[in-house]
């Protein structure tokens, strides 16, 4: 009779407590355990639900009103969710009515603010519902501290990242921030993305934008995202650029400091 052998230790197992990522799932023969398989199906269903969840701007509008912030509710050129998913280009532009409404807002209240903020549902309205209000509070506090003027917050249904370029251009803002629901992952249906563009103009590519991703409770905190955004905005205004020419060095250690001299962490997969 053969002696039972102990399965090899999974080097990833202890990391499950540190991340919601699908690692160290175990196995049952050549397949996944039933529990892991069911968790996968649930995560997939949650991701699909997040994509199709309708954007409800009313609670965010109420919060902004309580803070004394003006907001404008707009719609992209994609008339519904089905068209939005089939035609990404329509989500990058305002509808004709929305563009005219924004021109009217600029004519009445004036343009030329330092910073315009756009909130768009993107591919996860759930992320916007959960995190946009708190992130806007950090942005407002940052702007107040730096003395930056703010345009009205624009809330956009069926919007994609590039729609911020048109909004920023119509508002004549120096820079635009887009808060948008990111494409849901299997462990993150509510991840909020933040995109910064200096001198926004229709036709900009992704190369002109800086991205701060995965803003959520289990990812990047609001405070950490605000810290990175503060660095990027200050540098964008100082250097008059954004995108690939502007690197996020907010946490870069300074030469000669204790932080810079610390040894690099060991690879946990290597033996001690």
UniProtKB/Swiss-Prot annotation:
It comes from the Bacteria. Pathway: Amine and polyamine degradation; ethanolamine degradation. The keyword Cytoplasm does not apply. It catalyses: ethanolamine = acetaldehyde + NH4(+). It is an enzyme of class 4 (lyase). Adenosylcob(III)alamin binds at residues 161, 182, 211. One of its GO terms (molecular function) is cobalamin binding. The keyword Transferase does not apply. Pfam families: EutC. Its cofactor is adenosylcob(III)alamin. Keywords: Bacterial microcompartment, Cobalamin, Cobalt, Lyase. Its EC number is 4.3.1.7. Binds between the large and small subunits. It is found in: Bacterial microcompartment. GO terms for biological process: amino acid metabolic process; ethanolamine catabolic process. InterPro entries: EutC, EutC_C, EutC_N. NCBIfam families: PRK05465.1. The basic unit is a heterodimer which dimerizes to form tetramers. The heterotetramers trimerize; 6 large subunits form a core ring with 6 small subunits projecting outwards. Belongs to the EutC family. Catalyzes the deamination of various vicinal amino-alcohols to oxo compounds. Allows this organism to utilize ethanolamine as the sole source of nitrogen and carbon in the presence of external vitamin B12. This is Ethanolamine ammonia-lyase small subunit. It comes from Xanthomonas campestris pv. campestris (strain B100). The gene is eutC.
């Amino acid at each position: 009779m053969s002696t039972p052998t102990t399965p090899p230790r999974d080097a990833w197992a202890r990391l499950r407590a540190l991340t919601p990522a699908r690692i160290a799932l175990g196995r049952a023969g050549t397949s996944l355990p039933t529990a892991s398989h069911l968790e996968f199906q649930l995560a997939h269903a949650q991701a699909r639900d997040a994509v199709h969840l309708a954007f409800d701007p009313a609670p965010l509008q109420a919060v902004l009103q309580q803070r004394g912030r003006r907001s404008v509710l707009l719609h992209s050129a994609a008339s519904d969710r089905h068209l939005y998913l089939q035609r990404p280009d329509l989500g990058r532009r305002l509808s004709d009515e929305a563009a005219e409404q924004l021109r009217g807002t600029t004519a009445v209240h004036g343009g030329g603010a330092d910073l315009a903020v756009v909130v768009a549902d993107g591919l996860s309205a759930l992320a916007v519902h959960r995190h946009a209000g708190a992130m806007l509070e950090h942005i407002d506090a940052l702007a107040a501290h730096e003395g930056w003027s703010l345009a009205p917050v624009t809330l956009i249904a069926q919007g994609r990242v590039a729609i911020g370029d048109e909004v920023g251009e119509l508002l004549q803002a120096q820079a635009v921030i887009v808060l948008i629901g990111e494409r849901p992952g299997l462990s993150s249906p509510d991840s909020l993305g933040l995109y910064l563009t200096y001198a926004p103009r229709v036709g900009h590519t992704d190369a002109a934008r800086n991205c701060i991703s995965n803003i959520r409770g289990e990812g990047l905190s609001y405070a950490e995202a605000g810290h990175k955004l503060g660095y990027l905005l200050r540098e964008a205004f100082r250097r008059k650029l954004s995108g690939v020419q502007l690197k996020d060095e907010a946490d870069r250690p300074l030469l000669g400091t204790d932080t810079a001299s610390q040894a690099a962490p060991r690879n946990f997969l290597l033996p001690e």
